[in-house]
Regions:
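Short, conserved acidic/polar surface loops in the N-terminal third of protein domains
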Residues: 75-81, 114-117, 163-165, 186
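Active-site-proximal, Lys/Arg-enriched surface segment
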Residues: 2, 30-109
Length: 186
Protein backbone atom coordinates (compact mmCIF):
# COMPACT_ATOMS: atom_id res chain seq x y z
CA UNK A 1 0.00 0.00 0.00
CA UNK A 2 2.71 2.48 0.99
CA UNK A 3 4.74 1.60 -2.11
CA UNK A 4 1.64 2.21 -4.25
CA UNK A 5 1.04 5.61 -2.63
CA UNK A 6 4.66 6.65 -3.13
CA UNK A 7 4.90 5.29 -6.67
CA UNK A 8 1.57 6.72 -7.83
CA UNK A 9 1.81 9.93 -5.81
CA UNK A 10 -1.97 9.73 -5.29
CA UNK A 11 -4.31 8.54 -2.54
CA UNK A 12 -7.13 7.17 -4.71
CA UNK A 13 -7.34 3.40 -4.33
CA UNK A 14 -7.58 2.91 -8.10
CA UNK A 15 -4.42 4.98 -8.66
CA UNK A 16 -2.55 3.11 -5.91
CA UNK A 17 -3.61 -0.20 -7.47
CA UNK A 18 -2.59 0.99 -10.95
CA UNK A 19 0.85 2.06 -9.73
CA UNK A 20 1.51 -1.44 -8.33
CA UNK A 21 1.40 -2.87 -11.90
CA UNK A 22 0.38 -6.33 -10.71
CA UNK A 23 -0.24 -9.30 -13.02
CA UNK A 24 -3.88 -9.62 -11.87
CA UNK A 25 -6.78 -7.41 -12.94
CA UNK A 26 -7.05 -3.90 -11.55
CA UNK A 27 -10.34 -4.81 -9.86
CA UNK A 28 -8.76 -7.74 -8.00
CA UNK A 29 -5.89 -5.52 -6.81
CA UNK A 30 -8.36 -2.86 -5.65
CA UNK A 31 -10.48 -5.48 -3.86
CA UNK A 32 -7.40 -6.82 -2.05
CA UNK A 33 -6.21 -3.35 -1.03
CA UNK A 34 -9.71 -2.42 0.13
CA UNK A 35 -10.08 -5.65 2.13
CA UNK A 36 -6.68 -5.14 3.79
CA UNK A 37 -7.47 -1.52 4.64
CA UNK A 38 -10.76 -2.59 6.17
CA UNK A 39 -8.97 -5.21 8.30
CA UNK A 40 -6.32 -2.73 9.54
CA UNK A 41 -6.44 -2.77 13.35
CA UNK A 42 -3.58 -0.43 14.27
CA UNK A 43 -5.34 2.91 13.79
CA UNK A 44 -4.99 4.05 17.42
CA UNK A 45 -1.22 3.43 17.79
CA UNK A 46 -0.62 4.95 14.35
CA UNK A 47 -2.55 8.09 15.31
CA UNK A 48 -0.69 8.38 18.63
CA UNK A 49 2.66 8.14 16.81
CA UNK A 50 1.50 10.83 14.38
CA UNK A 51 0.35 13.13 17.21
CA UNK A 52 3.73 12.67 18.92
CA UNK A 53 5.39 13.94 15.73
CA UNK A 54 2.95 16.86 15.48
CA UNK A 55 3.66 17.91 19.08
CA UNK A 56 7.33 18.34 18.17
CA UNK A 57 6.32 21.18 15.83
CA UNK A 58 4.11 23.21 18.18
CA UNK A 59 4.43 25.23 21.37
CA UNK A 60 1.94 23.78 23.85
CA UNK A 61 1.48 26.98 25.80
CA UNK A 62 0.18 29.04 22.88
CA UNK A 63 -0.56 26.71 19.96
CA UNK A 64 -3.72 27.48 18.01
CA UNK A 65 -6.08 24.61 17.18
CA UNK A 66 -8.61 25.34 14.44
CA UNK A 67 -11.80 23.25 14.62
CA UNK A 68 -14.35 23.34 11.81
CA UNK A 69 -17.40 21.53 10.50
CA UNK A 70 -17.96 21.05 6.82
CA UNK A 71 -19.89 18.86 4.43
CA UNK A 72 -19.35 16.60 1.47
CA UNK A 73 -22.25 17.07 -0.94
CA UNK A 74 -23.12 14.11 -3.15
CA UNK A 75 -26.27 15.31 -4.93
CA UNK A 76 -26.07 12.85 -7.83
CA UNK A 77 -25.18 9.77 -5.78
CA UNK A 78 -27.85 7.22 -4.97
CA UNK A 79 -25.77 4.16 -4.06
CA UNK A 80 -23.28 5.44 -1.48
CA UNK A 81 -23.92 4.00 1.95
CA UNK A 82 -25.44 6.08 4.76
CA UNK A 83 -26.20 9.15 2.65
CA UNK A 84 -28.30 11.63 4.59
CA UNK A 85 -29.81 15.02 3.96
CA UNK A 86 -27.36 17.85 4.61
CA UNK A 87 -27.23 21.56 3.97
CA UNK A 88 -24.61 22.18 1.28
CA UNK A 89 -22.69 25.14 2.75
CA UNK A 90 -21.48 26.30 -0.67
CA UNK A 91 -24.98 26.62 -2.16
CA UNK A 92 -27.27 26.70 0.89
CA UNK A 93 -29.43 23.95 -0.63
CA UNK A 94 -30.53 20.72 1.04
CA UNK A 95 -28.93 17.75 -0.73
CA UNK A 96 -27.55 14.26 -0.09
CA UNK A 97 -24.12 13.88 1.49
CA UNK A 98 -22.03 13.62 4.63
CA UNK A 99 -20.94 15.91 7.45
CA UNK A 100 -17.35 16.33 8.62
CA UNK A 101 -15.49 17.60 11.67
CA UNK A 102 -11.83 18.52 11.31
CA UNK A 103 -9.19 19.97 13.59
CA UNK A 104 -5.71 21.24 12.75
CA UNK A 105 -3.03 22.74 14.96
CA UNK A 106 -0.84 25.50 13.60
CA UNK A 107 2.88 24.73 13.56
CA UNK A 108 5.28 26.75 15.69
CA UNK A 109 6.03 29.03 12.75
CA UNK A 110 2.29 29.42 12.13
CA UNK A 111 2.74 28.66 8.46
CA UNK A 112 1.59 25.07 8.37
CA UNK A 113 -1.72 23.66 9.67
CA UNK A 114 -1.14 20.09 10.85
CA UNK A 115 -4.31 17.95 10.83
CA UNK A 116 -4.96 16.28 14.19
CA UNK A 117 -8.57 15.07 13.93
CA UNK A 118 -10.85 14.25 11.05
CA UNK A 119 -14.12 12.38 10.86
CA UNK A 120 -16.76 11.97 8.18
CA UNK A 121 -20.17 11.03 9.56
CA UNK A 122 -23.81 10.76 8.57
CA UNK A 123 -27.15 10.97 10.35
CA UNK A 124 -28.10 7.78 8.49
CA UNK A 125 -25.35 5.71 10.13
CA UNK A 126 -26.17 3.11 12.76
CA UNK A 127 -25.30 4.48 16.18
CA UNK A 128 -25.38 8.13 15.11
CA UNK A 129 -26.41 10.31 18.06
CA UNK A 130 -26.10 13.92 16.91
CA UNK A 131 -23.76 16.40 15.28
CA UNK A 132 -23.13 17.88 18.74
CA UNK A 133 -22.07 14.44 19.99
CA UNK A 134 -19.59 14.07 17.09
CA UNK A 135 -18.22 17.56 17.78
CA UNK A 136 -17.78 16.77 21.48
CA UNK A 137 -15.92 13.55 20.55
CA UNK A 138 -13.50 15.71 18.57
CA UNK A 139 -13.07 18.13 21.48
CA UNK A 140 -12.47 15.22 23.90
CA UNK A 141 -9.77 13.85 21.61
CA UNK A 142 -8.10 17.27 21.56
CA UNK A 143 -8.35 17.52 25.37
CA UNK A 144 -6.68 14.12 25.73
CA UNK A 145 -3.83 14.98 23.37
CA UNK A 146 -3.15 18.71 23.79
CA UNK A 147 -2.60 21.12 26.65
CA UNK A 148 -5.41 23.23 28.15
CA UNK A 149 -3.26 26.22 27.21
CA UNK A 150 -3.69 25.61 23.48
CA UNK A 151 -6.23 28.04 22.06
CA UNK A 152 -9.16 26.28 20.43
CA UNK A 153 -10.73 28.43 17.69
CA UNK A 154 -14.19 27.63 16.41
CA UNK A 155 -16.70 29.16 14.00
CA UNK A 156 -20.25 30.23 14.83
CA UNK A 157 -21.58 26.69 14.40
CA UNK A 158 -20.06 26.05 17.83
CA UNK A 159 -21.81 29.03 19.45
CA UNK A 160 -23.93 26.84 21.73
CA UNK A 161 -24.02 26.35 25.48
CA UNK A 162 -22.84 22.71 25.21
CA UNK A 163 -19.49 23.88 23.89
CA UNK A 164 -19.09 26.79 26.30
CA UNK A 165 -19.79 24.41 29.21
CA UNK A 166 -17.30 21.89 27.84
CA UNK A 167 -14.44 24.40 27.65
CA UNK A 168 -15.22 26.17 30.92
CA UNK A 169 -15.49 22.89 32.86
CA UNK A 170 -12.00 21.91 31.68
CA UNK A 171 -10.50 25.41 31.97
CA UNK A 172 -9.46 25.25 28.33
CA UNK A 173 -8.66 28.37 26.33
CA UNK A 174 -11.02 28.97 23.41
CA UNK A 175 -12.35 31.53 20.95
CA UNK A 176 -15.79 31.04 19.39
CA UNK A 177 -17.11 33.34 16.70
CA UNK A 178 -20.50 34.38 18.09
CA UNK A 179 -23.76 34.35 16.17
CA UNK A 180 -25.49 37.66 15.58
CA UNK A 181 -28.20 36.84 18.11
CA UNK A 182 -25.77 36.02 20.97
CA UNK A 183 -26.28 38.33 23.96
CA UNK A 184 -23.04 39.27 25.69
CA UNK A 185 -23.06 41.13 28.99
CA UNK A 186 -20.08 43.41 29.49
Amino acid sequence: MIYGILAGNKLHLSEIARSLKEEVTLKKTMDRLSRNLNAFQEKQPLMQNYLTLVKQHIKDDYAVIVIDNSDIAKPASRKLEALSEIRDESTGEITQGYLTIEAAVLSESGKMPLPVYEKVFSAAENGFVSETHENLCCLKSLSENFSRKCIRTLDRGFDANDYYRYFLKRSERFVIRAKKNRNVNT
